[in-house]
Every structure is written in C-alpha cells, then in structure tokens.
Amino acid sequence: MSDAYKLLVLAGDGIGPEVMREVARIVHWMSAHRGLKLEITEELVGAASLAVHGVPIRDEVIELARQSDAVLFGSVGDPAWSHVGFDKRPEVAILKLRKELELFANLRPAKLFDALIDASALKPEVVRGLDLMIVRETVGGIYFGEPRGIETLPDGSRRGINTEVYTTSEIERVARVAFDLARKRDNRVCSVEKCNVMESGLLWKEVVTDVHKREYPDVQLSHMLADNCAMQLVRDPNQFDVIVTGNLFGDILSDLASMLTGSLGMLPSATLGPVRADGKRNALYEPIHGSAPDIAGKGIANPLAQILSFAMLLRYSLNRAEDADLIEMAVSNVLASGLRTGDIMSPGMARVGTEMMGQAVLREMEKLA
C-alpha cells in the first residue's frame, strides 16, 4: 500500500467513537467506489488512553501523527478525570498534538446549509448563502507573549500583564495559508487587526500587504479593524470569503461566525502546520464540539461535524476536492430531506440518531456518485 495515504484516526472520548464510526462507513465506501486508498491507524487518546496507558497521549502516537498525511481527531474530555493534575487531564492530548506537530493555522469554516437557515441567529435574507473561512494564527499573539503574569505593586494593588507579540515570519506563514485557500475559493482575503492602536497590528497589516504584493497579486486583499469586522459579520456576513487574523481576534471572531450557522454540532475545523520536507503539511482535522459525555453511548450525537471534518481532510490534505464536494452535497441533501439529530431539531422535521444520520449521508452519496 505504498501509494496509499496514511491516516491516523484518534476517536477519543465521549461521543468521539460514535461519530467516528459513521466516518468509517464513508471511508469504506469511498475505498470501494472512489478509488480512495487509505492506510489507517487507530490509536487511543484522552481518557481512553489514560485508562489503558496512564497518559493522555503516548509519544508513539505523536510520532505516528508526524508520519501521517493527516490526523482525524474526535474529541477528548471526561469528568471522571477532573480531579487529577493538569498534565493527566484528557484534554492534554489535543494540546500536546498541536504543539508537537507545530500546528499554527486554524481553519474554521462557517457555511450555512439552506435547510438550517431558520436556526441561524440572523434573518434569512442576511445569512442566506453564507460560506466563509476564518484563518486564525494559533501560536503567537497575546496568549503566548512575554512578559506575562500577575504582580503585586508597592502600594499593595495587583497588576495583570499580557503581551501581544508577533514576528514577521509568524505573520507571513499564516498569510500564505489564507491566500492559498482563497485561490481555491472566491479569491478574496480580508486581513483583520487593530493597526490604529496596536503596533503588532500595524506590523501585521504591513507584512500581509507585502506577502500579497510579492506572491499573491492575483488575490483580492482588503484590510479591516477587528471591532468593525465583528460588526460586519453580523450586518453582512456574505461580504467575506477568507478572513485571516491573529490569535485573540481569531478566537473571538470564529466563535461569533459559528453561531451564524445555527449549530456547533455542524461545524468542522482544521489546524495546519508548516510545510514538511516531503512537501506536505502536518494537519489535524476535528469537529469543534466537545466530547459531550452527557449523551455519550445514547446514539443521539450529531455525526455531521465529524463527517464534514473528513471532507475538509480530503480537500486540504489529500487534494481530493471532488470527494469533499460529494460529502458536502450529500449532507446538504440529507438536511433538505428533513432529517435532524436532536441538536438541530425543529418543528416538522424527522428526528434520527447518530447511526441513521450517518447512513442517510452514505445513501445520498451513493445516489450522487
């Protein structure tokens, strides 16, 4: 299987294994009918790994991730482990993976399926047709800058300190990710910062402008202040194609954009690393929802975010855009038929569980293929 793509599957905890099973059905079908060759390795992470190996993620799993074409991640988290030290928490698995793989660019799509338009927080006429991508830089900025901390002043009062720091290279590489994505979409990038009050924002704007001029003159570039961007996302979200921004603003804006779609259970994500010696990027794909231990094992979890995360993997790591389109169209058609899991249920629709939703997507793929 030397010509097969290497895929590491980490289902994790809670509903992770349940929703990942529905992806496995799709993978099996695509292997049989679409010529998709995958060499799949499955490993334990999170609480599942703690129970067997005593650690949230083993070093061997991280090495497997480095050698893979992509990592498909479920979710981690289990309240049964809330009493242990931080380094033993299930959530450490995903944090360590992101660090060891040097993942720096988080891709958060906000795409509204027509059938869910009434679930959006905005009026249908404002949000119809929504399809934007937020690219968030995740290793720099105020979350990691030094100095930081809380100190006691001579008068006894306390002061909290955080420092916003960005370097040219950090900005350049995330800008390239955004411009490359735009070329595969509607060819538009909006760079977001606060250059009017922050020197780091001024550098951000200058560097993005320079990368655009030197390497991507064919892509349409605009600039917007972060506070204005938040307002514009609510006023007219369809003006955006790709938004690229720093860690703090990306954290806020991507959560805002997620609610334009109506349900966190529908949203996939990707996080990309630098280009490796073999020309590929380390990449991890995961739904943005958590492990949902309260519904784990009940067969009612929404598998669509996990399925759509696999579609992103096909598109961005395996360069199989047609296969990704097939999955996304199948999901759209299933929703249009009226099938809903509980988290996206609305009057007049038909409630189904995890397995039935996954099977419906697969049947629709068979019709479309």
From Swiss-Prot:
GO molecular function, one example? NAD binding
Q: Give the protein name, as stated in the record.
A: 3-isopropylmalate dehydrogenase
| HAMAP family found in the cross-reference section | LeuB_type1
InterPro entries assigned to the protein according to its UniProt record, in alphabetical order: IsoCit/isopropylmalate_DH_CS, IsoPropMal-DH-like_dom, Isopropylmalate_DH
Q: Where in the cell is it found?
A: Cytoplasm
Keywords for this entry? Answer: Amino-acid biosynthesis, Branched-chain amino acid biosynthesis, Cytoplasm, Leucine biosynthesis, Magnesium, Manganese, Metal-binding, NAD, Oxidoreductase
Q: Which PROSITE patterns match?
A: IDH_IMDH
Task: List positions binding substrate.
Answer: 98, 108, 136, 227
Q: Which family does it belong to?
A: Belongs to the isocitrate and isopropylmalate dehydrogenases family. LeuB type 1 subfamily.
Q: Which SUPFAM superfamilies match?
A: Isocitrate/Isopropylmalate dehydrogenase-like
Concerning Pfam families, the annotation shows: Iso_dh (PF00180)
The site annotation (Important for catalysis) covers 143, 194
Q: Where is the signal peptide?
A: none
Q: Which reaction does it catalyse?
A: (2R,3S)-3-isopropylmalate + NAD(+) = 4-methyl-2-oxopentanoate + CO2 + NADH
Recorded hits in Gene3D superfamilies, A to Z, give: Isopropylmalate Dehydrogenase
Its quaternary organisation is: Homodimer.
Q: Which positions in this protein are listed as binding Mg(2+)?
A: 227, 251, 255
Task: Give the enzyme's EC designation.
Answer: 1.1.1.85
Q: Which coenzyme or cofactor does it need?
A: Mg(2+); Mn(2+)
One Gene Ontology term from the biological process aspect of the record = L-leucine biosynthetic process
Under the heading NCBIfam families, the entry gives: leuB
